Regions:
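Elongated, mostly alpha-helical coiled-coil "stalk/stator" tethers of large membrane protein machines
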Residues: 1-181
Length: 181
């Protein structure tokens, strides 16, 4: 079976279950924390993939990694289902698929802004206002980072769309024009 299909099916079923329970937003935060934990800690993925670590320990690790407690029954039930079906190894992919589904259903766009230097609050506000004008009614999740290689300016990535307003890009375009002549 397709490796990407399994997590998507589980995530879709989880979203429907969370919707019935009125827990989609809470579960979104839990899954976002879980995905970040996997990204930040390679040992978590190694432990979940390790066949010598028993399932109860893996479940405990995944509860802790997601910042979940006993009151988060939807997430706990989901982990029980993954355990019963021998699919704990797909926990990260299921979390990412759930995030995608939730964002799609709620018109949430992840926005990555990379600049040559840290942006001040006024610059961030102007960029955010411009994006809000182009995507009315949508919610955006902003992440900011810096990359000195850009020389100056910034890039904005919304989903699969990218705006490149960097000095490095301008120099590259100028170079291509000069070489074409």
């Amino acid at each position: 079976m397709n490796e990407g299909l399994i997590p998507k099916r589980y995530a879709k079923a989880l979203y429907k279950f969370a919707l019935e329970k009125g827990e989609t937003k809470r579960l979104y935060a839990t899954m976002a924390t879980l995905a970040r934990s996997f990204d930040d800690n390679a040992q978590l993925a190694a432990a979940v993939a390790n066949p010598f670590v028993d399932d109860s320990r893996k479940t405990s690790l995944l509860m802790t990694a997601a910042g979940a407690d006993a009151s988060d029954t939807v997430y706990a039930d989901f982990l029980k289902l993954l355990t019963q079906n021998r699919r704990l190894g797909y926990a990260r992919e299921c979390a990412l698929a759930y995030l995608d589904i939730y964002r799609h259903e709620n018109r949430i766009y992840p926005v990555a802004i990379v600049s040559a230097r840290p942006l001040d609050a006024d610059e961030k506000a102007r960029i955010e206002a411009l994006l809000a004008k182009h995507l009315p009614g949508a919610t955006m999740e902003y992440s900011y980072s810096t990359d000195p290689a850009l020389i100056g300016g910034f890039t904005v990535t919304v989903g699969s769309e990218r705006l490149d307003a960097t000095v490095a890009n301008e120099l590259k375009q100028l170079s291509l024009k000069l070489l074409a002549k």
